[in-house]
């Protein structure tokens, strides 16, 4: 760049100016190495350059003349001026001491500053005083970076600015896509003004016709009503015109900002780094404004005025003074567009920016190290650990949601006449582009007053102090289980009493003695009870004659009094040894170079945490307390005396007679058969639910956040490939990653862009024979690849017509090769043949049966050919036949079994069970083919078997369930 020589010249001039100052007036961080060398060449006695430097036996050096003056010729010794050590003078005198050849060599160097050597010396001093870049850690000319506020070298600053420009390009494209909302709202306001004028004219005609019969008596009343209508018309016209003008100003501001940024990105005009950063923040806020901009058409454009004669029309002569009223008809549910709607949506609707992620990368690493240290220290302490950032974000989201629902319930009915004002949350918020324009116009002329039209601002939202924060998912789940099991009597579990509370010392000695006596007695009783229990357990273990079988098909670990916020430790078995080791939770990832033992001694790049399956658990070491418990149960079950009594013929006969009497006295034969069928069905359903709950322990967990091979950044769609492989959409890395059944990285394909074979935030994934179908969200198309990642063809485009998409999400393929696509923002499902030719479509926006609201994922049954669609924003699953005819729906919003909160991925196993990713509730739910709830597993968290924003699910050929744990950036296999 042309400014580089100028910057170097300024740096040299600054250095010369610092060197000309005395050392005391220089900055503390400036060092002249030549002055340090000069200090080393100065004699500490005469404070001048060494003259014939002599080295004493104590390794201190002085000038020969100085040593002559310090020598004691009478006693022939010399005391070192530095360390006061006494040395004998040689026979030949002080000159016989060893010369310091090193200092002599330095003194012989001629350091005269000539015009040729001055530049080299200045360059040397300049390099010596260079700072280290805070990013690449190299010495260079560092200046504050406008992006990250850290001193960085030129290359790192340029890298940051390039990253910022890429983010600005993406923001620019999104703003252009969403800009039509303001234009449409402005056009609708113009139509609303015309419709409102027509409505008012019609109302005037009705009023005139009604009051013409009572012209003389009701003339005054008529004038009053007409005046009210005119006032209403003027007020509404003024409000709507003002709002339209505001929207037009918003549109012009946005267009100006877009054109200015577009010119800056294309290089048509120069722009400062700080201005670019400010514009990036402005566009980020503007994009948030456009996302939340959803004007209520009924509230703004369809407010109708209607004249009502009243119920006392027959008594009009007597009630002429109180007859008639004007009513403003506000459509029902006019306030259904909540301003907080976007605040508690799942994170996939908020894509992080590359520059923001890079900006806080080092801070995140430091905070992760701090959290790791906090977790380690909390394991050894008795205090509850602090809630992490994710749990705080979860509670905040729940709090915002509860607040929005309370405001919706408590909202009043239609506002009264002439006191209402047009309030639209999405329209009344101040746009960032307007603020940007005001800032630019005020900066040149600060003294000139500026009048602005400021829309209504939102009042600050307050949370009632009496409202309790929502419970974490673990505690909520426990409450549900307790409520479900409340009708049945629960066995009384032994509860360990807490220790007596420590009281503060008082000045009353007698009271302190009593308290201490009570404390000692309580401690003695506890010690005695522990000793007795240990003696009983030791006697039981010594007198045991029955072997305990440890070869169990499944191990159930019961956690007693576990803290909700604790880190779940995982158990993993070392193959061939039969010993169990504690594996840290997957969020504490191992370094990339650490070897992972998974049955073979291979070294992989990404940690893959394997868990003991159900096949080989014969060598698992059972804890002592669990072994004693099983021994007691085994002993009571195999006691020969009790066994003989209960297996005798007489006892069995009495039991059979009692059962027959009960059956004959209460039921008929048909009822007996029904009861038997119901019992068998209940036992089967209970057994099936138990088997599904037992699968909540993952077999393997792999992946972590990053962009390297095997790393993931917001994984979304997933599908099973032939050969036991699994493919997933690495959404924020704009690629598809393929892993084997053990979690080892195999290959990847795709890449960021809009060209052939490139992707922009891939979401859905499906496989058919030798092809992989990927939904390319922001390119609004479907891309078809071969199994090896070679691009075959693409189809689609942005729009609302047939074969056009608006943010396509999930894809599915049936046995005939037909491709089903969930067209999310068009609220429909489109069907294509295997070559991408349009066949049919079904679904429309709404909440009625057969309508969809942001459909996300699709699954097609291979047996019934039914199409299952996750109707996400309606919190349900909609089922269609192959022709698009709606059959039924199941599910509703909630957190109980069978209820959903933004459901996403759907998979169908070999038994036609539906496995659904309940994203908002962070769990997997299982239903039968008729939509009846079977079981669920999973909860919120970062441990094994825990989920954060589960996205998609698939079933492999061996029956394993593979889940994309989106916000944990990993894959879990159950």
Curated annotation (Swiss-Prot):
Disruption phenotype: Double knockout with par-2 mutant (it5ts) partially suppresses the lethality phenotype of the par-2 mutant (it5ts) at 25 degrees Celsius.
Zinc finger (RING-type): 43-84
Key words, A-Z: Metal-binding, Repeat, Zinc, Zinc-finger
Pro residues: compositionally biased ranges: 488-501
Signal peptide span: none
UniProt xrefs under InterPro entries: 6-blade_b-propeller_TolB-like (IPR011042), NHL_repeat (IPR001258), TRIM-NHL_E3_ligases (IPR050952), Znf_C3HC4_RING-type (IPR018957), Znf_RING (IPR001841), Znf_RING/FYVE/PHD (IPR013083), Znf_RING_CS (IPR017907)
Stretches with biased composition (Polar residues): 416-431, 447-465
A GO term, aspect molecular function: ubiquitin protein ligase activity
Mapped NHL repeat ranges: 699-742, 746-788, 792-835, 839-883, 887-930, 934-974
Biased composition annotated in UniProt, kind: Low complexity: 529-538
Skewed-composition ranges (Basic and acidic residues): 9-19, 437-446, 511-528
A GO biological process held by the record: protein polyubiquitination
Stretch list, region Disordered: 1-29, 360-395, 416-548
Keyword set includes Metal-binding: yes
Pfam families linked to this entry: NHL, zf-C3HC4
TM helices/strands, residue ranges: none
Taxonomic superkingdom: Eukaryota
UniProt cross-references to PANTHER family, sorted A to Z: E3 UBIQUITIN-PROTEIN LIGASE NHLRC1, E3 UBIQUITIN-PROTEIN LIGASE NHLRC1-RELATED
Subunit description: Interacts with ubc-13.
Stated name of the protein: RING finger protein nhl-1
